[in-house]
Structures are given as structure tokens and as C-alpha cells.
Amino acid sequence: MAAGPALVLASASPRRLDLLAQVGVTPDRVDPADIDETPLRDETPRRHALRLALEKARVVAARAPGDFVLAADTVVAVGRRILPKAETEADVLYCLKLLSGRNHKVLTGVALIAPDGRAATRLVETKVGFKRLSDAERDGYVASGQWRGKAGGYGVQGLAGGFITDLQGSYPSVVGLPLYETLNLLSGLGYRP
């Protein structure tokens, strides 16, 4: 019997792979998309997250015709301001300054392209409250390095989890992949593990 279409995860994020494993989904392979993630002029955080997820899926689908391709992008926003993925100490200090003592949104766009080329997307928005950080908390977090490569400079599953005062929405989405919506996308487009 011939094997069905493969599931390709268009992400290098170990967190997304772990989240999928929690619900019994194991991608056949991982093929990260390398795209320009710079926000477009006047692009809202919602549109940005969805656009990047779909763009990542399309780039990888072109390399994997006949397979399912799953992609996601997580954006942290304070109002309409999209925070960067922190790569430097300057990035994380900027993010922490904006997040400290405020509510913000974590938006995760998910895109799935089916073997026949059909595409579907979902966007999950979660409201997150951040405590006001003391200088010692901020400096300790920066020294930890846990912020590297994270949208908005933090991961809720690490030290920064202690800064969260409130979370309204999807915890897995804040980690990097909304599981309920992702499973619905997969089944809706005919993926069967």
C-alpha cells in the first residue's frame, strides 16, 4: 500500500514540534522557510502573523508538491506596535520596556496547504498581562539568554512565565502553536496521521 501525503512542518521551532507531539501529530519532516519577516508599512499585527504563516507555507509547499505543509508565525504586539524577535540585548531591553506593567497581545497565525493546493488559515489572539519589572528582574532575565529568538523577547514556558499576571486565550498559542485550531485545520483539509 502506498504511503499517503507527508506532513511537512515549515518551522525550525522545537516548541512547535513538541506541541504537535503532545497531541499525537508527528511531522514526516521539518523544512523551515527562510523569508523576510519585516512588517509591511501600515501592516496590522493580525495581518502580519497571517501573512507570514501563509508565506512560509507557500515557500515550503513549492519544494514539497503533493504533501501537506503546516506553518505558523507568532507575533507579540503592544497596541499596533509589532515587537521584534529578540536577537540582541538591545532588542530584549526594548521589548521588556514596552511589556513591563502592560497588557499585550500574542497573535499566532497558522497556515496549512493541502496536497491539492488548497490553503486554509487561522489566527488566534491571546491577551497577556505582564507585571511591572524591577531593574533586578529585568537584568536577571536579560542575563539568562532565554529571550534569544523569541517573539517579543520572551517565552511563557521559561523564566518569563513568572512575569505573566494574566493570560486570556490559548496558552499553546503563546508558546507557538494553537493546538485546537491546528488540529481543526489538519482534519478540515483531510490530513490523517
Curated annotation (Swiss-Prot):
One Pfam family of this chain: Maf
Cited InterPro entries: ITPase-like_fam (IPR029001), Maf-like (IPR003697)
GO biological-process terms attached to the record: nucleotide metabolic process
UniProt catalytic activity: dTTP + H2O = dTMP + diphosphate + H(+); UTP + H2O = UMP + diphosphate + H(+)
Key words of the record: Cytoplasm, Hydrolase, Nucleotide metabolism
Function of the protein: Nucleoside triphosphate pyrophosphatase that hydrolyzes dTTP and UTP. May have a dual role in cell division arrest and in preventing the incorporation of modified nucleotides into cellular nucleic acids.
Signal peptide start-end: none
Site feature (Important for substrate specificity) residues: 15, 74, 157
Family: Belongs to the Maf family. YhdE subfamily.
One example GO MF annotation: dTTP diphosphatase activity
Recorded GO CC terms: cytoplasm
Record-listed E.C. numbers: 3.6.1.9
Protein name: dTTP/UTP pyrophosphatase
Cofactor: a divalent metal cation
Subcellular location: Cytoplasm
Gene3D superfamilies attached to this UniProt entry: 3.90.950.10
Active site residues of this protein: 73 (proton acceptor)
